[in-house]
A protein has these predicted regions:
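N-terminal "arm"/small-domain region of PLP-dependent enzymes with the aminotransferase-like
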Residues: 1-12, 213-216, 347
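Phosphate-binding glycine-rich loop
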Residues: 7-13, 17-59, 73-77, 83, ...
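Conserved PLP-binding active-site segment of the aspartate aminotransferase-like
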Residues: 162, 270, 277-288, 309, ...
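Conserved PLP cofactor-binding pocket of PLP-dependent enzymes
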Residues: 196-208, 253-256, 294-333, 338-343, ...
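Active-site region of PLP-dependent enzymes
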Residues: 142-148, 155-278
Length: 376
C-alpha cells in the first residue's frame, strides 16, 4: 500500500513483485519449478485445462462430488464433462473412472480433492498411466496435505490451489497453479495476462519456452494483483504447517466425540492420507429428506449451522451435479446420489476449543436422537 504498486507488472527497480515472490515461495514449498498466480482457483483450473491443450468439445473426466467452480472451469474451457461416481468415503470411484475413460475416450481428469478427502493417489496415478489420462488436481481444500508423503498438486500435470477466505491460506481470493511442465507453465503465464512481462515472474521457464507460445496465446486477464499476494506470502511455511496441525486437532476432537452416534457415520481416513481438515463431513445413511431437514433445523435452533448436500435446491456454497443444468442432461451417478442424500458438512474454525467441539457433538447427538425417536 505504501508503494502504490498494486498491479504486478510495469517498470520496476528489478525487485520481485509480491506476486512473483509468492509464486517462487509456493513453488519451493511444493518442490516444483513453476507456479503461476491467478485471481482465483477457478481461474487456475480453467487456465490449467487450456494450457494442457483441452479444446472446446473435448471430453474431460471429473469426480462429481465437488463445488461449482470446478464445473464452471470445465464450462469456461468449453469441455464436455464426463462425471465420475464416488465411493462411500466421498473420494472418486476408481473403477467407474476406468469405465468412463474407456467409454468416453477422455484423456484429461480434473480431480477434485473435495473437502480435503484424498483418494489412493498411487492407484489413481496407475489408472491415469494405463488409460493415457493427463491429471489436473483441484487442491482448493488440500494446501499442505498429501498422500503417502507426497503433496497434493504434485501428482499430475498441474495442481490448482485456492487462497479464498475459507481455505488454508487466506488472501480473500486468489489461485495458484503449479506444474513441472515448462510448456504448460509458459502457456499459463501468458493466458493469465502477463503481456510481455513474463520475465518478471518468480518461478517461470526459460525465454525459449515462451518463444514457442507468445504469438498464439491470448491474454485472458486473470492474473493476481500485489495486494492478495502480500497477504498470502507470510502465511506459507511454518504458519501453514501450524494451521494444518491445529485444524487436524479440532477434526480429531470432533470426530472422536461423534464416534458411535446412532444413525451417523464419519468415514475412516487411511493412514496414507495426510489430510488438513478445515471441515468435517458426516453421513446420515438411510434418513429421509424430511427427517434430515428436521435434524438441521434442530441444530440451527441451538446455533449450529450445518450444510447438506442432499437438498433439492442449491444453497450458499453447496450444490451438486443435478443443479448444474448448463451441463445438459443429468448424468446417472447412483452411488453419489445415495451418498449425497445424507451428506452433511461443517467448517472447523481454528477458534474452536476442545470443549467447543464436545458441545457441538452434543448438539448433533441430541438433535439426531430426537429425530430418530420421532420416527420410532
Amino acid at each position: 500500500m505504501q508503494s502504490g504498486k498494486l498491479h504486478r507488472y510495469g517498470e520496476t527497480d528489478g525487485k520481485l513483485s509480491p506476486v512473483s515472490a509468492l509464486e517462487a515461495a509456493f513453488a519451493a514449498e511444493l518442490g516444483l519449478p513453476y507456479c503461476v498466480a491467478l485471481n482465483s482457483c477457478g481461474s487456475s483450473m480453467f487456465v490449467a485445462l487450456k494450457s494442457a491443450g483441452v479444446m472446446p468439445g473435448d471430453a474431460v473426466l471429473s469426480n462429481c462430488f465437488t463445488l461449482a467452480p470446478v464445473p464452471g472451469a470445465l464450462a469456461h474451457a468449453g469441455a464436455r464433462p464426463v462425471l465420475v461416481d464416488v465411493c462411500d468415503d466421498y473420494t472418486i470411484d476408481l473403477a467407474d473412472l476406468v469405465r468412463k475413460a474407456r467409454s468416453s475416450g477422455a484423456k484429461t481428469l480434473l480431480l477434485s480433492h473435495m473437502r480435503g478427502h484424498i483418494c489412493d493417489m498411487q492407484r489413481l496415478s496407475e489408472v491415469c498411466a494405463e488409460q493415457g489420462i493427463a491429471l489436473i488436481e483441484d487442491c482448493a481444500h488440500t494446501m499442505g496435505a498429501g498422500w503417502a508423503g507426497r503433496a497434493t498438486g504434485t501428482w499430475g500435470l498441474a495442481g490448482c490451489f485456492s487462497l479464498q477466505s475459507y481455505k488454508h491460506a487466506n488472501s480473500g481470493e486468489g489461485g495458484l497453479l503449479v506444474t513441472r511442465d515448462p510448456d504448460l507453465a509458459a502457456r499459463a503465464i501468458l493466458y493469465s495476462g502477463s503481456y510481455m512481462f513474463y520475465a518478471a515472474h518468480g518461478a517461470r521457464p526459460d525465454e525459449a519456452v515462451f518463444e514457442r507460445w507468445k504469438y498464439n496465446t491470448p491474454n485472458f486477464s486473470l492474473r493476481m494483483g500485489n495486494l492478495p499476494a502480500a497477504l498470502a506470502l507470510p502465511q506459507l511455511g511454518p504458519l501453514l504447517a501450524d494451521r494444518g496441525r491445529r485444524w487436524n486437532q479440532r477434526y480429531h476432537w470432533l470426530s472422536q466425540a461423534l464416534a458411535g452416534t446412532p444413525g451417523l457415520t464419519v468415514p475412516a481416513r487411511p493412514a496414507q492420507e495426510q489430510y488438513v481438515a478445515s471441515s468435517l463431513q458426516f453421513s446420515l445413511p438411510g434418513l429421509a429428506p424430511a427427517a434430515i431437514q428436521g435434524f438441521l433445523a434442530l441444530c440451527a435452533g441451538r446455533g449450529l449451522h450445518i450444510k447438506w448436500f442432499g437438498a433439492v435446491e442449491p444453497k450458499g456454497f453447496t450444490s451438486v451435479w443435478q443443479h448444474w443444468r448448463f451441463f445438459g442432461e443429468p448424468q446417472l451417478l447412483p452411488n453419489a446420489e445415495r451418498v449425497m442424500a445424507g451428506l452433511c458438512d461443517m467448517r472447523l474454525p481454528l477458534t474452536l476449543s476442545e470443549p467447543d467441539c464436545q458441545a457441538i457433538a452434543a448438539v448433533v447427538r441430541d438433535s439426531l436422537a430426537q429425530v430418530l425417536a420421532a420416527q420410532a
